[in-house]
A protein has these predicted regions:
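Long, polar/charge-rich, low-hydrophobicity segments
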Residues: 222-223
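P-loop NTPase motor domains
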Residues: 1-135, 151, 192-196, 201-207
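Conserved ATP-driven motor cores of ASCE-family P-loop NTPases powering translocation/secretion/packaging/pilus
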Residues: 118, 122-217
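Acidic, low-complexity intrinsically disordered tails
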Residues: 229-230
Length: 230
């Protein structure tokens, strides 16, 4: 794999045409009928609904920083979401297993991924095993209550309990008792984030609790600008 360029790998078009050209031939190990079944399985990735996602040369660069823009995907069909999430999570975990230096996996809008059973199981496994492969996992969500769905409370509690450091900002207009119970917070700790105060948050580091004000370093404005994420 280290000697091949991304353009050296076949696309689904090439695979489909290769099998189609041989579908009427007879082989000892595979029948013509079996090859036609294979064509049916891969047709959606060849020229069907999944073709825009799967049928083409990869545009993933093997660089130090890779960004997967999932916004449009998460608005698509359930079938597309499952297929792409499976491929991406498999790719990410394989990269982590290589142990090529230190790796950080950052996931924004965590609650959206927790809606998928496969992703819940995958994230749970990653969080428990990542440190063995010189990796760390960083997750963020605007509303932690969106993650506290009773249907998958066990998997989410595993994610929360395995996280050594948590940053909690003001939670907005939500039921604080639910968050207090999920994160084992005391009344005084919940008070720290009960009001919306810009840049103030509660940090949970193991058994330690810190009420802090988040500042900026001199060079950060040059790197990120003043748009506040815009």
């Amino acid at each position: 794999f280290f000697h091949l360029e991304h353009r050296d790998y076949p696309t689904f078009t090439e695979l489909y045409q290769f099998i189609e050209n041989r579908a009427d031939e007879s082989y000892k190990m595979i029948s013509s009928e079996m090859m036609k079944h294979i064509l049916l399985y891969i047709k959606s990735a060849y020229d069907g609904a999944l073709s825009p996602l799967f049928n083409g040369i990869t545009n993933i660069d093997a660089e130090d920083f890779i960004d997967f823009d999932m916004r449009d995907l998460m608005q698509g069909s359930e079938e597309c979401q499952r297929a792409v999430l499976f491929n991406i999570s498999t790719y990410l975990w394989n990269r982590i297993l290589l142990k090529e230096g230190w790796t950080m996996l950052a996931i924004d809008e965590l609650h959206m991924y927790l809606q998928h059973p496969y992703m819940r199981k995958t994230l749970q496994s990653m969080v428990l095993r990542a440190r063995k492969y010189n990796a760390m996992i960083w997750c963020a969500t605007q509303q932690i209550t969106h993650c506290l769905n009773p249907q998958y409370a066990y998997e989410v509690s595993s994610l929360l309990n395995s996280s050594p450091i948590k940053f909690l900002f003001n939670l907005g207009d939500v039921e604080l008792g639910e968050v207090k119970k999920a994160l084992s917070l005391k009344d005084g700790e919940i008070k720290c984030i009960a009001a919306a105060v810009k840049r103030h948050c509660l940090v949970l580091a193991g058994k330690e609790r810190y009420a802090i004000e988040v500042g900026t370093l001199p060079y950060e404005e040059h790197l990120f600008g003043k748009g506040g994420g815009q």
